[in-house]
């Protein structure tokens, strides 16, 4: 592993180091917290992200999310960090990372690397849908208890009960809806290098630019 102090001595600027950093492999330590853990690996030479494999999964009902354990912790030199992204194959699922992009402070964090996913058809979504459909049933004067009438397919009552059944099924069998299973590659890790930053408060006006204060959507669609 290359100490950052040596980098600063060898190169005058951070950008100068970036130009040659790929020529020198960087050692990142990974510790297996479980014998079944799989070390991160590149699927192809030239890949940016290393595939991360789940060794177990648990469902957290309170937050309606699936927690995937990698069984790995890691250590890097100062000034290195890691991004956690979903894999491109995630598009085949209805899941997304809870924090969208994870950041591992691997120079100081020694805990397990986890991936937390939520399904777009979450419990809250299903519950909200059921409440809306129940309201529609109430407006139409239809009973909302299953035994009070024969449910006809395609009606508001039918949609309401389907939502209730879906909600109960997630509660009683959450793993059926897990986006990934044990042994799947659930995400990817990208190692990045970052410089020291000094925040400097200024009383002076910032330099003028062509863009100025134009914000969201200022360049058009």
Regions found by a protein language model. Name each.
Residues 1-221:
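DUTPase catalytic domain/fold
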């Amino acid at each position: 592993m290359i100490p950052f102090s040596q980098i600063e001595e060898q190169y005058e600027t951070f950008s100068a180091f970036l130009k040659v950093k790929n020529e020198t492999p960087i050692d990142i330590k990974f510790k297996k917290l479980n014998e079944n853990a799989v070390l991160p690996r590149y699927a192809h030479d030239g890949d940016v992200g290393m595939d991360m494999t789940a060794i177990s999964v648990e469902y957290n009902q309170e937050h309606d999310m699936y927690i995937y354990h990698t069984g790995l912790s890691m250590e890097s030199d100062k000034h290195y960090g890691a991004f956690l992204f979903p894999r491109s194959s995630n598009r085949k699922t209805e899941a997304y990372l809870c924090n969208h992009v994870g950041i591992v402070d691997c120079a100081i964090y020694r805990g397990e690397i986890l991936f937390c996913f939520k399904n777009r058809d979450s419990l809250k979504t299903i519950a909200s849908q059921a409440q809306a459909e129940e309201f529609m049933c109430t407006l139409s004067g239809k009973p909302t208890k299953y035994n009070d009438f024969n449910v006809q397919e395609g009606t508001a009552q039918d949609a309401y009960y389907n939502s209730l059944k879906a909600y109960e099924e997630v509660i009683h069998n959450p793993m059926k809806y897990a986006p990934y299973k044990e042994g799947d590659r659930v995400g990817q890790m990208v190692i990045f290098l970052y410089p020291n930053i000094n925040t400097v408060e200024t009383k002076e006006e910032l330099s003028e630019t062509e863009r100025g204060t134009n914000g969201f959507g200022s360049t058009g669609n």
